[in-house]
């Protein structure tokens, strides 16, 4: 049991690649928390995909013992949070579990959009923020400019920012001292009823669900009967411990401490991030504020390329869902692609991470259908439906209006690319909210439809700014707009996997582009194939794929025209019949390429 005044809880806030995980590694290494022989890069990022992409996906934690210059021993609890917008709710929970943040900014790059988003969350959580300028060993480092930028853009005093090189270990001692001296100690009442915040949870094959908790008030011991206040589920605690970063069992956790519990919990879905844990008997009356259930935002279909792998895919998806409560799925069948699953994700990075993990860890090749967002459909009889898949769109005559999700996008961009960025946002039906300058960079805030962003907005943004723009977004709600379902018909048969929701003004342009693309991608058959884009019964674009022609008159010698005509008529009749009964094979690449719409 540690005295409250000797505990410091903190997180590290940074943009991707600004050195957050490397700084965490150095703090762990320099305090001797991990033996040198056990040390490895990105120690807290357990998944291969986290290391490979250089991102943190789950909130990880480590308890560090540190003897400060004043001779006292302190316990430092670091929660290493995800930096990406898709995992923003995980970040906000982790922020509420600690009292301070280290704001890590790359001294060669300056402040980026995700830095901003996460700093604002830290400010919302009333954090004491210590700026850290990283990568000072690089020749391009310009600490004074970046410190000025932190003051201009974020409004935090950066005169005493710590200058470090996480790679070489310069400034690590100063960072540890700043954590002890400048960050506040936690508060809490040992004798009050137990209140513990559920920060994260994951599944372990031997222990069941492991729950990461921050104790706010009270004491949690092995053998206690606990209750989750959101779900009312009750469990007996069978193990309590802390991470150093390996698990170490302890007898109890008191106020201000961060650790883990196991309680024979079978499913991650039973433990909701942000929930309050209390004692079953004599528990707390009120839960901790700020709980929100996680809601999937982007949906898409996952289908195995080889239909015999469907059962393996089901197995893989069920195992991933054990560990990720924000990932939802249900079975779906498609005339074009066979059996698969309709899955819900927090955003595009979440979708990519899950898809990569299925392909890598379970060795299943996947086809991913067009990502779509959740639309609200208001029927004329007053009923409201949620539409996850454009193919399920009800009859338009019964629909009163549709609403689509909107986001607030913050884009930081060097001012020479500003015109291109504004044009891209206008093309995507954006409404400009704000434009400000910090040094030579512009900060643009746009209200955009999420539907226009989920596809390839990020790739387009990177290409028009040569990779210099950084982008971050938050959901802001739903708004009505003139949206229609565009179907694609190949040989007069609708292809459900290519149905998309588009704005009526852009439907013709989108439909024409889709038809032209499919014409190039579908191989020619023995009969001609019409490719059409339609809204309801009205065709808005059409391309015709011409037939392969066999020269049936090659054997005719001499000049008998009637013989030739007879053979050509017979061929024509055969092609007509073939077109009636023939099946058009659409290759897998056609689905993937047709959905990547280049404006």
From Swiss-Prot:
Family annotation (PROSITE patterns): G_TR_1 (PS00301), G_TR_2 (PS51722)
CDD domains listed in its UniProt record: EF4_II (cd03699), EF4_III (cd16260), LepA (cd01890), lepA_C (cd03709)
Membrane topology: Peripheral membrane protein
EC number, as in UniProt: 3.6.5.n1
InterPro entries: EF-4 (IPR006297), EFG_III/V (IPR035647), EFG_V-like (IPR000640), EFTu-like_2 (IPR004161), G_TR_CS (IPR031157), LepA_C_sf (IPR038363), LepA_CTD (IPR013842), LepA_IV (IPR035654)
Highest rank taxon of the organism: Bacteria
Domain tr-type G: 5-187
Keywords: Cell inner membrane, Cell membrane, GTP-binding, Hydrolase, Membrane, Nucleotide-binding, Protein biosynthesis
Family to which this protein belongs: Belongs to the TRAFAC class translation factor GTPase superfamily. Classic translation factor GTPase family. LepA subfamily.
Protein name: Elongation factor 4
Species this protein is from: Ruegeria sp. (strain TM1040) (Silicibacter sp.)
Lineage: Bacteria, Pseudomonadati, Pseudomonadota, Alphaproteobacteria, Rhodobacterales
Gene this chain is encoded by: lepA
